[in-house]
Amino acid sequence: VTNPPIDPFREKVVMSLQCPIGPEANILQPSALQVHRLWLKQPVISIADIEVFKHLSHRGWSSHVIDITFPVAEGAAGYLKKLQDICEEADNASKKHQIIILSDRKAGPERLPISSLVSLGAIHHHLIETRSRMKVALVVESGEAREVHHICVLLGYGADAICPYLALELASSLRDQGILDTSLTDETIYQNYAQAMQTGINK
């Protein structure tokens, strides 16, 4: 909180949502590794972007997808076990990959997703404890995130980037049904959504 409050409109020239993601080198030892990172213009990424991240192989970078769903039949015991498992999986992935993607895409009638906040927070703090957090970027692919508040909380819990795929797919579905302007492309839908999120985050 600032006093007077920051004005995102009048002070737009000095505000930025750019997100450098990936391994961070030691700032006390100048080297090319300090700039060997990905720079995003803002933290909300498209479905196409997340697919690029999943298949990344440029300049020695790679990614690892962690499924944050578990079988419904396993109940509470399965929930707790899965939470521990994803923390260990993230720790192992941090040794070989630069981007870790937390995804609930496999959620369905037989598989429940662990809350993206719970899984993200658990992994973020586990990697801090194992001194691995600065080695990787944490990207969240979640159907939960829809509103500005959801995005802000995920960022606060340690996310470097977020793909709110369900919100984007819903908008595309409404367009296909003729409820939204049928001339809108997937890219236009994403740009409009991302701009709305940016305005909300700045506020």
Task: Go through the PLM ranges and name each one.
Residues 24-25, 35, 72-75, 107-111, ...:
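Flexible loop/turn segments at secondary-structure boundaries
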Residues 72-75, 88-99, 105-108, 125-132:
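Conserved helix-loop functional segments at active or binding sites
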Residues 1-91, 101:
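Extended, highly charged accessory segments
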